[in-house]
Regions:
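Active-site beta-loop-alpha junctions enriched in small/polar residues
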Residues: 31, 175, 202-204
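Short, basic, glycine/proline-bearing loop/turn elements
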Residues: 26-28, 66, 170-172
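Secondary-structure "cap/kink" motif recognition
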Residues: 11, 16-25, 158-169
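N-terminal "mature head" segments of proteins
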Residues: 2-6, 22-25
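PLD/PLD-like phosphodiesterase catalytic module centered on the HKD motif
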Residues: 1-5, 11-12, 35-146, 152, ...
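N-terminal carbohydrate-binding/catalytic regions of secreted carbohydrate-active enzymes
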Residues: 24-25, 29-38
Length: 292
């Protein structure tokens, strides 16, 4: 298949397969990095002559890999995109980091033979290695994968616009949500006009011991959304780390961005707006399976 969607444990398996099969190059963006079986495999491929580059936002364990890696910092926000490019043509865009924590619940989309998208993503990695924080696709770049947006940019406004187009349903799974940003504004307006919105948030707690998403949970519930918290103890996972929304069973929004002000305005993020109903149906089927 040219396009495939993966969830949870499936993601590591496809990442491993793509790394093993790469012929020339592997370029990766991630927020957190730590030593893991996947990074061991990347080191092996580097020793075999494959060009391996990783741009990360945070090295969690201090491990220095035997491939090219840059840990980058920004004046505002964090470096948070999550994607892989293989041989300048195949792309995985994910909610998953390159870290030893594999038990988190995530989603990823593999696009094969997408050179336009691959070139855009590779230029992002190359810019980070050159210590250049370039504005890229801030209002959206049309590619074989759909519309790619890098924030800081217009990503949240574009998601809002997609929500405003909704006629029947919005189904979303998101790790972190705050109650004031364009995405939430669009969602609130869609609900007001009768769109059925079902949402699942992670129930992680901040340093104060309070559930971070509780305020957004209460706000959206009061507006008529069907909101629930994920229950990780039932699925042996550490956190619900998704960042996706399915609109009318046709349009899918996915990538690295949480629905927060930081995600909208400060962090480096990748967002994809895709109109392939087959992708939407796979995300929707997954959502329905966990929204019991």
């Amino acid at each position: 298949e040219r396009t495939s969607v993966f969830f949870d444990e499936e993601i590591y398996e496809i990442e491993k397969k793509m790394v093993v099969n790469a012929q020339k190059s592997i370029k990766i963006a991630t927020y957190t990095y730590s030593k893991s079986p996947l990074t061991d495999l990347l080191e092996k491929r580097k020793s075999e002559g494959i060009n391996v580059k990783v741009a990360g936002g945070k090295n969690r364990d201090g491990h220095v890999p035997q491939f090219d890696m840059v840990v980058t910092t920004q004046k505002n926000g964090i470096y948070h995109p999550k994607f892989m490019v293989f041989d300048s043509k195949d792309v995985i865009i994910s909610s998953s980091n390159i870290s030893s924590e594999r038990s988190a619940s995530n989603s990823a989309v593999l696009f094969r033979d997408v050179p336009v998208a691959a070139a855009i993503l590779e230029s992002e990695i190359d810019a980070v290695f050159s210590n250049k924080f370039e504005r890229r696709c801030e209002t959206g770049c049309e590619t074989e994968t759909g519309t790619i947006i890098f924030n800081p940019g217009k990503g949240c406004v574009l998601i809002k616009n997609e929500f405003l187009k909704a006629e029947k349903s919005i189904k979303a799974g998101v790790y972190t949500v705050t109650s004031k940003n364009p995405v939430i504004t669009g969602l609130k307006t869609a609900i007001k006009k009768g769109v059925d919105a079902k949402l699942i948030f992670d129930n992680w707690k901040g340093d104060d011991g309070k559930i971070v998403n509780k305020k957004a949970f209460n706000y959206l519930s009061s507006k008529g959304a069907g909101v629930k918290f994920d229950e990780p103890e039932q699925k042996n996972e550490s956190l619900f780390h998704h960042k996706f929304a399915v609109i009318d069973g046709v349009t899918t929004v996915f990538g690295s961005m949480n629905w927060t002000s930081s995600g909208c305005y400060r962090n480096r993020e990748i967002i994809v707006i895709n109109k392939d109903p087959q992708i939407a149906q796979k995300f929707e089927k997954y959502f329905d399976s966990i929204n019991q």
